[in-house]
Amino acid sequence: MSQLLQQLGTDNEFIRRHNGPASSEHQHMLNTIGAETLQQLIEETVPSSIRLPQPMQLPHGLSENAMLAELKQIAQQNTLNTSYIGQGYYNTHTPNVILRNVLENPGWYTAYTPYQPEISQGRLEALLNYQQMVMDLTGLEIANASLLDEATAAAEAMTLCKRGGKSKSNIFFVADDVHPQTLAVIKTRAKFIGFDVIVDNESNLDSHDVFGALLQYPGTTGEVKDLTDLIAQAHTKKTLVVVATDLLASVLLKPVGEMGADIAIGSAQRFGVPMGYGGPHAAFMATREKLKRSMPGRVIGVSIDSKGNQALRMAMQTREQHIRREKATSNICTAQALLANMASFYAVYHGPEGLKTIARRVHHFTAIVAKALQTAGFELEHQHFFDTLTVKTEQQTDILYTKALASSINLRKFDTKLGISFDETTTVSDLVTLLAVFGIDNAECETLSAEVGKDEFAAIPKHCQRTSSFLTHPVFNTYHSETQMLRYLKKLENKDFSLTHGMIPLGSCTMKLNAVAEMLPVTWPEFGGIHPFAPLNQAAGYTTLATSLKSMLCEITGYDEFSLQPNSGASGEYAGLIAIQRYHESRGDAHRNVCLIPSSAHGTNPATASMVSMKVVVVKCDENGNIDMIDLAEKIEKHQENLSSIMITYPSTHGVYEEQVREVCDMVHAAGGQVYLDGANMNAQVGLTSPGFIGSDVSHLNLHKTFCIPHGGGGPGMGPIGVKSHLAPFLPGHTENGVQGTDYAVSAADLGSASILPISWAYIAMMGEMGLTEATKVAILNANYVMERLRPHYPVLYRGSNGRIAHECIIDIRPLKEATGISEEDIAKRLMDFGFHAPTMSFPVAGTLMVEPTESEDLAELDRFCDAMIAIREEMHKVEQGEWPLDNNPLVNAPHTQVDLMSDSWDHPYTREVACFPSSQSKDSKYWPTVNRVDNVYGDRNLICSCPSIENYEE
């Protein structure tokens, strides 16, 4: 290619779109840092012993249009049959007002988990609506704000039964009519936590001594029957009962809470979220009041702010992994907030009457087909059903299944039966085509409808029909026109801070650009419309995509094989530690159960180790934030015979490249252990070093950090794991398609949240080797620039041997608090007045702020943040000098709202302008928190996790 063609080409255009600082700005930043070139900065930052000797072998980057064209060709390899497979996954109509204004809206998908409630009231309200929806439809007293998928929710429920129950048994019962993918994940969890699992017909539950039981309602084969007596009988033996249920079925069926269930779990997928070949989807869990403090996952609660006004927040956080570490109720970190919001908006938009109409239509179509099949001489497995029929087809099974495929229809195949599940997208013409497969040509559906309609709910036993009301709160009975719904969505969106407003400098979270070109394919029907258990030849596009992405990730990480199954980073950690333990077991070393974890580690690390029955041994860090090599050597020697592994993060959670990391790996390997390298900080490795090159054996990657899947306000995420070849046989398997074996599944679907894989594929394809490496260098440049600008004003806790940091830095507020009385929380809240999300508070060191600007923020935004932090330091000085009292200053009173600005009274020693417009930039583009500082203690002492009365919403 000629030099001119290269100059005019667009293949590298995306790189400068993704990276914030223009190349012309680099020199100014380097001058501030004290480096002559970017390469000099990298050499002073990344230890030479771990720098890659040659570039990654990846294709050159593509332009946005070229990438989209190539990805469209891949997507078109998928075959979109009409799916009647069911099994927890259903086609659905995503209301366009939700599709455009939530799923495709960066105001919703680029927000972070709502740890800062003052700037998160919109999505907190949406998640509270989700909890209310789940509570109403299940008939239980409290619900969480989503889990990863139905199968992992069932596994979490199993452990909740053990924590919350009084039975001394170590056995968990699973009914034989539970979805097989759910059973597979439960078996994995049970094996490594030390439980036994019994699978039997639910009628035999009473003959077993078990601490918990999982039933399905309706069953996987479609049967509807009252479980009340069965549950009551189980309770007499101190058995807690979990029921996996269906939200749409619960509109017409007696809710499981009214039957006595202790816990309900399931998927909210069919409430407007595409199947997406398995995800992402929001799972749900609801429980009795008595189990609330043991329930896993985020829970949204109602509290008050400093002015006594209602404010929402994440409640009961002290039970979560980032607080309790190895004693946490779960390792859950990322959940499925964006998808939970979509499901809650689906319920808000349709309301109870709309949902009843949808449920009635689905059931009516099922009854029509049941009538037609029985009239034609087919026998049904069950006479009572909601949306699923199991047809006894005996010797005709293969013939009918193949005939259906020829008509572009997917049925669920059993040995001598066929399953048919209906959904809201089913039409009358679909029924005609389907019945023709069974030899019923030109079916008179209108005649059948009239006949079935004489007793519309004959297929639902009287005692299983719902009589209780649901979704009575005004929020579910108001926004039914598109105009109303649009304004409600926009009202909530406007309450929240996202990347559309400014930088989110959260350390360890990598809130980088989620480019529109990366996001576009997520809503393509070729990716969204495939059932995860469709025949593999119909998912050829997904197979191509997964193979390509795994190859890219292997090259980037230095690993030999990848599994894309884990639905989050925490799930990836879990799968990785299982691979290690299975490897030890295969070598006769099943006794190796000690996991070494540095004191700086993220809370998921010890929580995950506990989930696989490991003994956590903490390794000290030295005064520079590095692993204490003397303490490490002592711990290895002490536990050598039982050493399983070490979990490290690189660069360390303290934000520095530890120069002795290879020595750490060698020491653990010499003692027979494996090295788990947490991929949370991969954004500082790509193209410069890699986990495999460093010497680790297994890592998870947070695709929602380094590889551009958006955080979604608390999910979705993906945590695929890469391994060296010796661990490859121990990657997660799956029951439905046999890829990599059939055991040790960690997610309901083999490719986990498959429909968001195109985001990471697109990012890598557009950046190429040069762009990815450049992004890492710019992330390091940005972080060091911020550090050097702040260092004269704030102590920086840890730096490398040359005074550099990796991609994030820790600002130590403790000495400033001693001098001024102002805390890290005060600074975090005051940043909201300047138009910023707070950095990470008190992690990994209490009393600190951790800042990660990422490569996507430009120089002007970095300066705006630094100027805000410097201005806040000057405000702290005024408190220190007595100009402002400690109990009445703009920091302790932050954040300030529009109501504060308009208030008739003002009893503060600073002006309204100082309060609300502390910088010139805040005047130009002001973001307003909608509540004052939220009272966390009040919220936990007065726990309310349901929608408040409408009066509380009036403004």
Swiss-Prot record:
Reaction equation(s) it catalyzes: N(6)-[(R)-lipoyl]-L-lysyl-[glycine-cleavage complex H protein] + glycine + H(+) = N(6)-[(R)-S(8)-aminomethyldihydrolipoyl]-L-lysyl-[glycine-cleavage complex H protein] + CO2
Modified residues (N6-(pyridoxal phosphate)lysine): K705
Cofactor: pyridoxal 5'-phosphate
Alphabetized GO MF terms: glycine binding; glycine dehydrogenase (decarboxylating) activity; pyridoxal phosphate binding
One GO CC annotation: glycine cleavage complex
Keywords, sorted A to Z: Oxidoreductase, Pyridoxal phosphate
GO biological process entries: glycine decarboxylation via glycine cleavage system
PANTHER family recorded: GLYCINE DEHYDROGENASE (DECARBOXYLATING), GLYCINE DEHYDROGENASE, DECARBOXYLATING
Subunit description: The glycine cleavage system is composed of four proteins: P, T, L and H.
Similarity comment text for this entry: Belongs to the GcvP family.
UniProt name for this protein: Glycine dehydrogenase (decarboxylating)
Organism: Aliivibrio fischeri (strain MJ11)
Lineage of the organism: Bacteria, Pseudomonadati, Pseudomonadota, Gammaproteobacteria, Vibrionales
Gene: gcvP
